[in-house]
Structure formats: structure tokens, C-alpha cells
Amino acid sequence: MLFARAIGGLRIACKSQISPASLLARNHQGRSLRLCQRSYSINRKMSTNGTRLKKELDPNQGGDESKKTYHKQATGEAWKTVQSHSSDNDLKLYGSCFCPFVHRVWISLEHKGLDYQYVEVDVYRKPKLLLDINPRGLVPALRHGNWGMYESTVLMEYLEDLDQGKPLLPTDPKLRAHSRLWSDHINRHIIPAFYRYLQAQDPKDQVNFGSELTEQIGKLVEAADTTGPYFIGKDMTFVDVQLAPWIVRLEKVLKPYRGWPDPEPGSRWEKWVRAIEANDAVKKTTSDDQLYLDSYERYAENRPNTSQVREAINSGRGLP
């Protein structure tokens, strides 16, 4: 059984008790310069009329600067990959480092060994370069020359159709159909269950949605090749990449926020999870743990203005 686990936070405030009068009274002492420097450091965020300047908060922080928000730059191995793909290129991936849908396309590019440029965008500011491709301002978006397209599964299919690099879809028509069927299962059932579980605030709902997610993953595992370690055998293919970002986030998000259990030792599911975690393309596009903890706190607290995904899940609609 899955159990909810509360995550607590600690807020520390510090106030200066040094008045201008006390500073003047101690001007004859050698410490005065240090005190003035300290006073300046503490109060440099004050405006000229003595009022404290407000830090610009992201909308999903709910007006509380102690709340964590999404990261705007990759970290760890993913940051190294961003740097190595920062030069201008005809093939551009526009993404946000915390987004699992971006993660899919990014893994695909790395798996195939294609030459591309990664462009980090702030989807909550919706820059024009993104809106020119996707009027809804969502990521991932891909520009290839003067042509652009969006939606993660569509982009993965497009990269396959380029017929460059290592393929993700098998050559056998039956296995291709099998892969597309279970990719659809991931999009229709596993991903919504993931967000329902993460966003649920009532402990009973968390247990129910956790069970739903476990059940939907179980169906996928039953459809997988019995030997593995990947979905249809020894090599990573389309279904693996479709699921990989959420396998990463089971460990980095659901485990700390909802107590998601480790795979049962020796199980087919454990074998699959470990293969995904050890895959080079996955590792090269995955940031450090803190990025995911911070970026998904808003989902775990079900805050307003978090994302269109959050709104769709709360209203019972399909994913945007």
C-alpha cells in the first residue's frame, strides 16, 4: 500500500537592529566601517524612500517567496548537454528543463545522435520565438529550417521519419503497431494517473490515485517483452522513451513527495526501471535531484497557476 508523506519547510528571517544613531555614536571606533558595510549589505534591497523592494515572484508561488518554483536552467549532466548543443543549428529543440514532455524529445535526439541546438525557454513568459511555432506557447517545440511543429509524440514520430541515426520504432509492422498502442496507453492512462496522484491533497485520494497509477503501470509491464530489459527486448525503443521521463520522476518526485515505493527486487518492473536509469541518453538529459524537487513542489501542493496540465487534471479533462 502507498502512504502519503508530508514534506515540511523551514523559513528563517533575519532583521537588522543597527540604527543610524548607533552608527554615528560609534564613528570614533575602528569598527564603524565594518558596521556601515554590514548595514549596507542588510539594507541594500531597500528603495530610496525606505520601503523594501519586492522580489518578482513567479505566478505559481502564490505570492509567497518561501515557496519553491520551477527552474529556468538545467543542472548536472543535462546542463553539460545543453552547453554542448548551444551552437546555432538548423534543427532546434525549444524546451524547459523541468518538463517531462520536452525530456522525451531530448532523449530521442540524444539516442539518435543527431546534431541539434537546445534552446531553453521560459514557458510562463511565452517568448515570441516559441509562439511563432506553437500559438499556445507550450513546449516542446521543434524548428527545422523554416518549419516548426510541436507535441512530444508528434515530434518523436517526425524524428523517426527523418530516417537518421538510431531508430526507435522497430521495423516489424506488428511491433510498430504494438509500440504505438502502448504509447497511447502511457499518454491516456499512466501520465494522467501520475498527476492525479501528485496533485491530490486528501490522504484517501492519494491512496486511491497511487493504486490507479500502480495498476496502469502493471498493465504496461504485462504487455512488455518478458525478458527485456526494455519494452520489446534488449534495446531502447519508442515506448521506453515515451515512459522514461516519468520513470525518472517516480524516483525524483513521487518518492519524496508521496512515498512512491522502489520496484520489487528481481521483478520485471525493476529490470526495466534500472535499464532506463542507466541509459546514456536518459542520463545526459536528466538534471540533479534538486531541480525536480523544487520544480514539482507546486504540483505536490496543487497550487493555482501551476500549469495547463494541473488545470486539466483538476477539471477531469484530457492533457493539453
Predicted regions located by residue number:
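Residues at alpha-helix termini
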Residues: 112, 133, 254-258, 280
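Short alpha-helical "patches" and their helix-cap loops
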Residues: 170-173, 207-211, 256-271
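A contiguous, mid-protein "functional segment" used to position or interact
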Residues: 263-297
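GST superfamily/GST-like fold recognition
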Residues: 233-256, 264, 268-271, 276
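Short capping/connector residues at structural and topological boundaries
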Residues: 173-174, 235-236, 287
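Surface-exposed helix-capping loop/turn segments at secondary-structure junctions
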Residues: 222-234, 256-257, 279-286
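GST-like domain detector, emphasizing the conserved glutathione-binding G-site
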Residues: 6-18, 24-27, 36-231, 300-304, ...
